[in-house]
Amino acid sequence: MAPPGILNRYLLLMAQEHLEFRLPEIKSLLSLFGGQFISSQETYGKSPFWILSIPSEDIARNLMKRTVCAKSIFELWGHGKCPEELYSSLKNYPVEKMVPFLHSDSTYKIKIHTFNKTLTQEEKVKRIDALEFLPFEGKVNLKKPQHVFSILEDYGLDPNHIPENPHNIYFGRWIADGQRELIESYSVKKRHFIGNTSMDAGLSFIMANHGKVKKNDIVFDPFVGTGGLLIASAHFGAYVYGTDIDYNTVHGLGKASRKNQKWRGPDENIRANLRQYGLEKYYLDVLVSDASKPSWRKGTYFDAIITDPPYGIRESTRRTGSQKEIPKGIEKCPESHVPVSLSYHLSDMFFDLLNFSAETLVLGGRLVYWLPVYTPEYTEEMVPWHPCLKLISNCEQKLSSHTSRRLITMEKVKEFENRDQYSHLLSDHFLLYQGHNSFREKYFSGVTKRIAKEEKSSQE
């Protein structure tokens, strides 16, 4: 990679959705394509404009072929806090870098993008005319130009107090757009097989990107449900595999989750979902299995484990077993036998997940999962820890005023040893981890209090 001093600067135009997830996604994708996150900005916060240094245009294009958090990327030619600063910055940009895109045989157009303000057509034309000092020699073509240039103006984040002049102005050459259209084309509303907790398409792709899923990877989901997370990974060329304890869900049986449909159809299953999107060739298998009792031989199989464990709200947390005493001489169960299940404590579920990931992920492989938390009691120490896994990112999605879930991304940094299996018991935060077990009670406690408060308000 080229040294930082000669890296080209690029401007990322970010989507104003899932704000906490944006930075980890961009960092993960740059790492995947051999780049490194280098920026002169101190903070990103909610701003849609990010200035990055990227080794090559190819890496910038590869980044945009994957990201669902960014709208577009531009080669940054100049920027400033006022028009005069922008023009001065543009005049200092090396002419030899401009010439290949401005010569007489080329066609171009200039677009205006404003954030938090709408300009009149007259104002737009005035801004474009002010750039006449740039050495444009080509012809204007508004329909199919070879090169597109953009003026981007940032008027801040407060729609109730829009300033007269922008906080920042940018000018650059458009390189590529992101993959925001995937959110609509893979929408759960259009999907053949769905469940009560099918993951939003946008979040599914974000999880795959956080997991650095790439072509020919093997991706596993131990709580597969209706397989929404597998679809996103398969779209990026990974082979997908899953397990779930629910026999009916795995086999597409029982009551339907879709409105005005009582029972699931004969072809409602995960494989049919992949077939719907032309991704069936990436389907390995989905099995009925208990995540608390992995049936795998020792070894590393998976490049990524991406999952959304049940929280006990819409889907129950279960594992196989019985509270009854089991006779020693019990006969062997037939193949069609469906075992009795017990409740599965959240803290146990997450430690089993981390241990399983540490054992079966390849070195450098990633675990991406959702951790539900009761917001008033949450601290970073409550995030489960494992000696083989390094925490990469921790992003919050609010569910209600008192609950949220956090997208946890971890990377395997050392090989698993038997002594690592019970390392969480030695952690100073073990009692904090066990606090996850009461998430369901706290969730419904908050709901009950809210309903009571609303009823009281309506009576007054």
Curated annotation (Swiss-Prot):
Record's GO cellular component terms: cytoplasm; tRNA (m2G10) methyltransferase complex
Keyword Acetylation part of the UniProt annotation: yes
Chief subcellular location: cytoplasm
Pfam assignment, any one: UPF0020
Modified residues (N-acetylalanine): 2
Catalytic EC class: transferase
EC number: 2.1.1.214
UniProt keyword terms in alphabetical order: Acetylation, Cytoplasm, Methyltransferase, RNA-binding, S-adenosyl-L-methionine, Transferase, tRNA processing, tRNA-binding
Catalytic activity annotation: guanosine(10) in tRNA + S-adenosyl-L-methionine = N(2)-methylguanosine(10) in tRNA + S-adenosyl-L-homocysteine + H(+)
Localization terms from the record: Cytoplasm
Coiled-coil annotated spans: none
MF annotations from Gene Ontology: methyltransferase activity; tRNA (guanine(10)-N2)-methyltransferase activity; tRNA binding
Example of a GO biological process term: tRNA processing
Described purpose of this protein according to its UniProt entry: Catalytic subunit of the TRMT11-TRM112 methyltransferase complex, that specifically mediates the S-adenosyl-L-methionine-dependent N(2)-methylation of guanosine nucleotide at position 10 (m2G10) in tRNAs. This is one of the major tRNA (guanine-N(2))-methyltransferases.
Assembly, per entry: Part of the heterodimeric TRMT11-TRM112 methyltransferase complex; this complex forms an active tRNA methyltransferase, where TRMT112 acts as an activator of the catalytic subunit TRMT11.
Family: Belongs to the class I-like SAM-binding methyltransferase superfamily. TRM11 methyltransferase family.
Stated name of the protein: tRNA (guanine(10)-N(2))-methyltransferase TRMT11
Organism: Bos taurus
Gene name as annotated: TRMT11
